[in-house]
Amino acid sequence: MQMSDISFGVTDWSKVERTEHKGETGMAYWRTQTFGGIRVRMVEYTPGYLADHWCSKGHIILCLEGELHTELADGRKFILTAGLSYQVADNAEPHRSRTRVGAKLFIVD
């Protein structure tokens, strides 16, 4: 990843517009900024959220609050809690996430 054409700045995430995204169950609320072609998001999943698709996009995800369960297409499963992160490349390992208790995430892709 090459970070270029990004001036120094501070983001107050509480002031970034929140958009709703329905899961198979539950909701995801995104606050999204783009910096030089890099998408950066603060995402909140409601309790009971299950993604409505298998994702093949690459991400770096840091769990800030709650608990995120991620399953890979090959059957492996991982749990993130506050302070844990995962990273995956584009088109590398399809994955799908869920949460029983809700989760707040910081995502770079």
Language-model features: locations:
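A short, N-terminal "cap"/entry segment at the start of jelly-roll beta-barrel domains
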Residues: M1-R41
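Short acidic-glycine-tyrosine-enriched beta hairpin
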Residues: D74-N91
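Short, conserved beta-strand element in jelly-roll/cupin
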Residues: Y45, W54-T70
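A short hydrophobic beta-strand segment most commonly corresponding to one strand
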Residues: S85-V88, V101-D109
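Short beta-strand His + acidic residue motifs that chelate non-heme Fe in jelly-roll/DSBH
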Residues: D52-H53, T70-E71, V88-A89, E93-R100
